[in-house]
Curated annotation (Swiss-Prot):
Topology class, membrane: Single-pass membrane protein
Name of the featured protein: Synaptotagmin-1
Origin species: Homo sapiens (Human)
UniProt note: domains: The first C2 domain mediates Ca(2+)-dependent phospholipid binding. The second C2 domain mediates interaction with SV2A and probably with STN2.
Record flagged with keyword Lipoprotein: yes
Gene field: SYT1
Post-translational modification Phosphothreonine, affected residues: 129
Length: 422
């Protein structure tokens, strides 16, 4: 029995032993994660093998990798920022409707726009409507009025003109006042002009001055009396406030005429251009020496038949209406733009320098007849405008020559100013 059972046991197949020996992966399929890990491991191993072949130290390779990554990130950042900026600009353009776009025409029209706006603001402050705006210029034409008198002395053939007073003059100065004076002259010759004294800071000056014109009664009817009110300006051209004209053939000289007349806007008469002259002034106080250098002239009036002139310059040193010294330049033939560069010196003590006048006259030389004056100008005591500035600059800069251009004036007008302002 024992032998039989033992024999059966030896004859039976070893099932359990076979089952334990078989591996699990032989009976179950591999998972996807495990396949990817194997591929990555192989790629990593291959990359490291190639990396070890490069003849660079590991730290250098790491630095190169970092720089490459930074470059890529920078490019991405710039691209994103540019896209966002374009979107913002488009939105702003749509919202604002192109208000920020200013062209050259807008810039050029800026001044005009501001001026128009200022006028509108003025109208708003005064409460004017559009309909009233058209009538406003008529009210602005009120320039004040002037009282005068006229008489004729038949025994002495003299026209007597009295300038009595002015009233309601407009304010032309910054302080809300004016410095008025009156010019009186006869047309058409304008040879003799008179001026009243300047009354400072007033709109209602009282003059009470009389002027005399020597005119035969037979010639008086063809003349017109002009009375013009000016605002005196020490450092620039005097502004005309207004004027009026009185034809002499409309005046009854059988009695004295005295009346008020409203001032009207002055007619813009084109003054005959006589030319310009340039000269320098230099004063040395310690030596009492005044030096005048006549440099050049330009655009002189044509005096000769051929359309040219033979100009030369006279320089007079004057005080209290008296000629103290006289000098003159050489004659420049056939030219309207002469160049001189000639120097003249005068002895003027320091205590007298503010009391003298330098009168510069440009004349046309004539061999046969009288030398005709082209134009004239004076600097020094009682000068005004550009002439006063030139004189003041000379005194403010002793020992230094100060050159300046001056516009020539009619000889008779300058002589009248010199005679009145003694």
């Amino acid at each position: 029995m024992v032998s039989e059972s033992h024999h059966e046991a030896l004859a039976a197949p070893p099932v359990t032993t076979v089952a334990t020996v078989l591996p699990s992966n032989a009976t179950e399929p591999a998972s996807p994660g495990e396949g990817k890990e194997d591929a990555f491991s192989k790629l990593k191993e291959k990359f490291m093998n190639e990396l070890h072949k490069i003849p660079l130290p590991p730290w250098a390779l790491i630095a190169i990798a970092i720089v490459a990554v930074l470059l890529v990130l920078t490019c991405c950042f710039c691209i994103c920022k540019k896209c966002l900026f374009k979107k913002k600009n488009k939105k702003k353009g749509k919202e604002k409707g192109g208000k920020n776009a200013i062209n050259m025409k807008d810039v050029k029209d800026l001044g005009k726009t501001m001026k128009d706006q200022a006028l509108k603001d003025d109208d708003a402050e005064t409460g004017l409507t559009d309909g009233e705006e058209k009538e406003e210029p008529k009210e602005e034409e009120k320039l004040g009025k002037l009282q005068y008198s006229l008489d004729y002395d038949f025994q002495n053939n003299q026209l007597l003109v009295g300038i009595i007073q002015a009233a309601e003059l407009p304010a032309l100065d910054m302080g809300g006042t004016s410095d008025p004076y009156v010019k009186v002259f006869l047309l058409p010759d304008k040879k003799k002009k008179f001026e009243t004294k300047v009354h400072r800071k007033t709109l209602n000056p009282v003059f009470n001055e009389q002027f005399t014109f020597k005119v035969p009664y037979s010639e008086l009817g063809g003349k017109t009396l002009v009375m013009a009110v000016y605002d005196f300006d020490r450092f620039s051209k005097h502004d005309i406030i207004g004027e009026f004209k009185v034809p002499m053939n409309t005046v009854d000289f059988g009695h004295v005429t005295e009346e008020w007349r409203d001032l009207q806007s002055a007619e813009k008469e084109e003054q005959e251009k006589l030319g310009d002259i340039c000269f320098s002034l230099r004063y040395v106080p310690t030596a009492g020496k005044l030096t005048v250098v006549i440099l050049e002239a330009k655009n002189l009036k044509k005096m000769d038949v051929g359309g040219l002139s033979d100009p030369y310059v006279k320089i007079h040193l004057m005080q209290n209406g008296k000629r103290l010294k006289k000098k003159k330049t050489t004659i420049k033939k056939n030219t309207l733009n002469p160049y001189y560069n000639e120097s003249f010196s005068f002895e003027v003590p320091f205590e007298q320098i503010q009391k003298v006048q330098v009168v510069v006259t440009v004349l046309d030389y004539d061999k046969i007849g009288k030398n005709d004056a082209i134009g004239k100008v004076f600097v020094g005591y009682n000068s005004t405008g550009a002439e006063l500035r030139h004189w003041s600059d000379m005194l403010a800069n002793p020992r230094r020559p100060i050159a300046q251009w001056h516009t020539l004036q009619v000889e008779e007008e300058v002589d009248a100013m010199l005679a009145v302002k003694k």
